[in-house]
Amino acid sequence: MARVTVEDAVNKIGNRFDMILVAARRARQIAVQGKEPMVDEMNDKPTVVALREIELGLVTSNTLDADERQTVREREAAEIAAVAAIAEGRVL
């Protein structure tokens, strides 16, 4: 297994602190939310996968923000559809 160098990920993000935040958000997406990794997992833990994705330039703070906004929009649309279905059921 090749070692992930944190320095490569830091260089992609800009500074060590932002890199930690981005890696933690992405690792949480993979581990908890069930998001698919953009690289081969190779039996690595979600944090290592997140660092590899950052290193390859696949994940940035902007891509995570856009993904989060899309998820919120989809969730809100589903809630509105559910409320509309309930309202239609009461009217009938």
Swiss-Prot record:
What EC number(s) does this enzyme carry? 2.7.7.6
Q: What function does this protein fulfil?
A: Promotes RNA polymerase assembly. Latches the N- and C-terminal regions of the beta' subunit thereby facilitating its interaction with the beta and alpha subunits.
Q: What Gene Ontology cellular component terms go with this record?
A: DNA-directed RNA polymerase complex
Q: Which protein, by its recorded name, is this?
A: DNA-directed RNA polymerase subunit omega
Q: List the disulfide bonds.
A: none
- SUPFAM superfamilies xrefs: RPB6/omega subunit-like
Q: Which organism is it from?
A: Shewanella frigidimarina (strain NCIMB 400)
What does the record list as GO biological process?
DNA-templated transcription
Asked if Nucleotidyltransferase is a keyword of the record, the answer is yes
